[in-house]
Amino acid sequence: LKLRSAADKKILHAEYVAETVRQMVFAQYGQETYTRGLNVYTTVQASEQMAAYKALRQGIMDFERRQIYRGPEKFIDLPADPKKMEDAIDDVLDEHPDNGDVLSAVVLEASPRKVVVVRQNSEQISITGDGLKPAQSGLSDKTPPAKQIRKGALVRITQTPKGAWEITQLPEVEGAFIAITPQTGAIRALVGGFDFAKNKFNHVTQAWRQPGSSFKPFIYSAALEKGFTPATVVNDAPLFFDSGVTGGQPWEP
């Protein structure tokens, strides 16, 4: 007999999907949403949802690595007494919980070549080499105290695909991901932001932005439908229509 705990189950990060569904149902049923025992079925696919979640976070974190290091999130005094130090570390880590694979840690020692951090349960991790590059500006003697990585600093760390550790930071930028079946309009995956617990604003359904170049495929497809090909030559010389053509003011688009 094998007992399977809740911890054995994989977490499906579909928080933005669930909140979007809740809002839609609430708009129709009001407070009865929470008492009618409704079952809601979506077209979201678990495997595709997780792939979208990981892809969005990876893309944002890759962007974050190219940004200047903004400094530790907090600084604490580390008592000399080991038990008091452990309690102080546990308290600050509880106040700043892990964000997915972006983990919180407290610095025990720091130099331009090596940083030693500690996690809960006194787990120590040494970070060297490329793992220090994203935060190199925070390890200089000339760095302002508020941005310097030093003993007692609360920092973020993450593990690279190769298994090495590196210092990172929670991103300030946001992003969104939606995958739709064009034939039916079914939503296969939806991620409204980097972290639902941090920011519940859904950048898929609530953000209003200029479409930019994303509109170009519609123009290209309309041109292809009318017989244009990649080899078609289009005369893009300036146009000018005088008053005789317009019947009023000259017009130059």
Write out the residue ranges for each language-model feature:
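Conserved catalytic neighborhood of penicillin-recognizing serine enzymes
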Residues: 7-13, 183, 228-253
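Active-site SXXK
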Residues: 52, 184-185, 203-234
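A short, well-structured edge-of-sheet supersecondary motif
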Residues: 103-119, 168-197
